[in-house]
Structure formats: structure tokens, C-alpha cells
């Protein structure tokens, strides 16, 4: 298994304007499901064949959060979201790349640029492939959501040994009535329950960042305490 590690220089934090960030990367050519799972449990995130985690000098606001699937019960409002999507077609498949995907990705990020002042990047086919398709091996999938045969949401996930790692989700803002972002996560939870998996790894919760603070609303959940290397056996998550 070829592995190359490197770090970025300090840069402006994408989540907190008054902070600086530094990222550690691992490039793993052919990552196994087991190694992926062990990295995710230790606070890493996968994009393509790259794994990353923050190693910021003066900040520890990025907290890895996971939902406890076996204890999770849908609320009344979440059941309403499911009912609104009774005719939404959901397909679980390996990651795809098409004009439809790229158009939807761009439309979502243009909307977020206007709504939340996100910094927008124009992704080429190759860049999308490198981030969301490459390296899916035997664990990477996408949940594709269709309304009247139109692709309206894509949720990229890894199905691992003890849970589902939620990588990235984007949707058509014209279909806001269907709460597609929330519906996609509820689908992840349903899949995990059916597969007897314990966790949904939601990535980083940042309390002071509106785009990431919502994750704490999904309870019960646990937060990773500290950072651990692969060779360290003790990984502590706490409610």
C-alpha cells in the first residue's frame, strides 16, 4: 500500500474568519476498507485517494462527530421530511460523474455563495473525479435522488465496517420544499440501521460555524477526544 504524507502551510481558515488553518494529508493509492475505517475513527476525512485532518497550531474547534445509529429515533419533523419524499427515487450506487452531476454541483455552490457567502470553486470533470469518484474501492458509494427523473441531490458516502462516513452532499436549491440535505442524512441512518452499523461519521462539527454547527442537532452523538495515530489503539469518543 503506497502512502505519502505531507502538510500544507498555514492559510486562512475556511470556517472561522479569525483563525488560521493547517492541514495534514495522507495520499493512499489503494486504501483498504479497514484502514479507511481506522483513519475515520481517528478524525481523518477522505476525498478521493487523499485523507486529511486539521493540525492547527492555536485552534481545536474542528471536532469529529458521529451519530449513534442504534439509539437514534426519527423525530416528528424528520418523519414529515420522509413523508414529503415518498415519491423521491433513491439509488445507492458507486460514485458517478456526468454533466448532470457537475451542473448540480455548480448550481448548489452558486446558491451557497449567495446565501452563506461560501467561497466558490469551479470544478472541472477531472477535479470532481479526483475528489469524489477516484479511490472508491469497495466502500465508496453515492446516494442519487431523483424527482420526476431529474437528479436533485447527490450524497457521497463510504460504507465502512462499523458505520457510514458521510463525505459530501449537494442538492438542487429549487427543490427546497423537500429538505433534501436532511432527507439524504436520514437515508444514511436508515441504511446503517438495516446493515447493523453503529455510527454515522459526520465529519467536523464547528460550534461557531453556521454551516457545520447543525451537526450537533442530530442526537445522540459522540465527539472524538484528541487525535490518535494509526498505531495507537485507544480511541476515545464521548457523548
Swiss-Prot record:
Has the keyword DNA damage been applied to this entry?
A: no
Domain of life the protein comes from: Bacteria
Q: Which residues cross the membrane?
A: none
Its top-level enzyme class, in one word, is: transferase
Provide the reaction this enzyme catalyses: N-terminal L-glutamyl-[protein] + L-leucyl-tRNA(Leu) = N-terminal L-leucyl-L-glutamyl-[protein] + tRNA(Leu) + H(+); N-terminal L-aspartyl-[protein] + L-leucyl-tRNA(Leu) = N-terminal L-leucyl-L-aspartyl-[protein] + tRNA(Leu) + H(+)
Which Pfam family is an annotated match for this chain, by its short name?
A: ATE_N
The record's subcellular location field reads: Cytoplasm
Whether Transferase counts among this entry's keywords is yes
Q: Which SUPFAM superfamilies match?
A: Acyl-CoA N-acyltransferases (Nat)
List the molecular function annotations (GO) for this entry: arginyl-tRNA--protein transferase activity; leucyl-tRNA--protein transferase activity
InterPro entries annotated for this entry?
Acyl_CoA_acyltransferase (IPR016181), Asp_Glu_LeuTrfase (IPR017138), N-end_Aminoacyl_Trfase (IPR030700), N-end_Aminoacyl_Trfase_C (IPR007472), N-end_Aminoacyl_Trfase_N (IPR007471)
Q: Which GO terms describe its cellular component?
A: cytoplasm
Q: Which UniProt keywords apply?
A: Acyltransferase, Cytoplasm, Transferase
What GO terms describe the biological role, i.e. biological process, of this protein?
A: ubiquitin-dependent protein catabolic process via the N-end rule pathway
The EC number(s) given in the record are 2.3.2.29
Per the similarity annotation, which family is this? Belongs to the R-transferase family. Bpt subfamily.
Function of this protein?
Functions in the N-end rule pathway of protein degradation where it conjugates Leu from its aminoacyl-tRNA to the N-termini of proteins containing an N-terminal aspartate or glutamate.
Q: What protein name applies here?
A: Aspartate/glutamate leucyltransferase
Q: Which organism is it from?
A: Campylobacter jejuni subsp. jejuni serotype O:23/36 (strain 81-176)
